[in-house]
């Protein structure tokens, strides 16, 4: 099996989502040359055929476009997960770059501004990704790349578990909608426990949205099924709430590091089916 690796190329973000696990070093992103080395490492391993760019907010890496273009030129299937709020800024996201992605993933936890602000899914001016901006972004992406797949990621917490987002699926033709039960995360004093949601409330959210996307994917547990490389080029192990470093892709071959990662092959296969 060839794998998808999630490159968290920056931890910089214009949002401060209270559930987010991306609370590492915000200031010392790797250089373009270092990310090229990591991408070459993945290619040489023969184990990886797809890269997902994540963050933080990935477009905030100073060399975002160059990193994407390099990965594309190496033949990887590319996707991105973004909060969407900066994707209409051509200086950060040149529109032609949409053509390089097979999938555009957008984090959408609510379309209610009050909920989004309570979650921290807003910038310093409390501006959020409105439904109109979301629609505009999807329209732009499809105008550049008509075959691009639109995927939504919704993290279910106790702040949005009772909301109804079915209008998104009804109007925007979402190919895949991942509904993720928030994972408890503790790192360097950060703790998202106050937002934990019950299994019953999570199941209720999924049931309400079951008919509005071609592919609804509820995810209760992501443990050891998400291959994550942080903004320092390190493969992380999420077996416990405290993420641990498995090894550096700047210093070792990916295959060597991956062999030390107690990866859950079955859960991974179920996550990425289809």
Swiss-Prot record:
Pfam families: Fer4_12, Radical_SAM. It is an enzyme of class 4 (lyase). Residues 1-215 form the Radical SAM core domain. [4Fe-4S] cluster binds at residues 13, 17, 20. Keywords: 4Fe-4S, Antiviral defense, Iron, Iron-sulfur, Lyase, Metal-binding, S-adenosyl-L-methionine. InterPro entries: Aldolase_TIM, RSAD2/Viperin_antiviral, rSAM. Its cofactor is [4Fe-4S] cluster. One of its GO terms (biological process) is defense response to virus. GO terms for molecular function: 4 iron, 4 sulfur cluster binding; lyase activity; metal ion binding. PROSITE patterns: RADICAL_SAM. Its EC number is 4.2.-.-. It catalyses: CTP + AH2 + S-adenosyl-L-methionine = 3'-deoxy-3',4'-didehydro-CTP + 5'-deoxyadenosine + L-methionine + A + H2O + H(+). It comes from the Bacteria. Expression of pVip6 in E.coli (strain MG1655) confers resistance to phages lambda, P1, SECphi6, SECphi8 and T7. Catalyzes the conversion of cytidine triphosphate (CTP) to 3'-deoxy-3',4'-didehydro-CTP (ddhCTP), probably via a SAM-dependent radical mechanism. The modified nucleotide represses transcription from T7 RNA polymerase-directed genes (possibly by acting as chain terminators), strongly suggesting these nucleotides block viral polymerase transcription. How this protein allows bacteria to resist viruses that do not encode their own RNA polymerase (such as lambda, P1) is unknown. Belongs to the radical SAM superfamily. Prokaryotic viperin family. This is S-adenosylmethionine-dependent nucleotide dehydratase.
């Amino acid at each position: 099996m060839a794998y998808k690796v999630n490159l968290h190329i920056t931890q910089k973000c214009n949002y401060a989502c209270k559930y987010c696990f991306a609370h590492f070093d915000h200031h010392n992103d790797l250089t373009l040359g270092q990310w090229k080395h990591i991408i070459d490492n993945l290619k040489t391993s023969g184990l990886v055929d797809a890269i997902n760019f994540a963050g933080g907010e990935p477009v905030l890496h100073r060399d975002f476009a160059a990193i994407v273009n390099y990965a594309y030129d190496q033949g990887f299937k590319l996707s991105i997960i973004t909060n969407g709020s900066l994707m209409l800024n051509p200086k950060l996201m040149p529109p032609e770059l949409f053509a390089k992605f097979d999938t555009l993933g957008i984090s959408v936890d609510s379309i209610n501004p009050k909920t989004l602000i309570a979650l921290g899914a807003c910038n310093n001016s409390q501006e959020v990704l409105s439904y109109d901006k979301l629609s505009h972004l999807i329209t732009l992406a499809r105008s550049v790349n008509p075959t691009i797949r639109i995927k939504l990621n919704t993290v279910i917490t106790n702040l949005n578990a009772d909301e109804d987002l079915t209008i998104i699926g009804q109007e925007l033709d979402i190919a895949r909608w991942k509904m993720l039960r928030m994972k408890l995360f503790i790192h360097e004093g950060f703790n998202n426990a106050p937002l934990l949601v019950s299994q019953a409330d999570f199941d209720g959210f999924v049931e309400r949205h079951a008919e509005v996307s071609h592919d609804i994917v509820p995810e209760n547990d992501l443990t050891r099924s998400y291959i994550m490389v942080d903004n320092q080029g390190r493969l992380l192990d999420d077996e416990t709430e405290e993420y641990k470093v498995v090894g550096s892709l700047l210093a070792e071959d990916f295959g060597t590091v991956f062999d030390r990662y107690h990866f859950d092959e079955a859960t991974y296969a179920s996550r990425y089916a289809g």
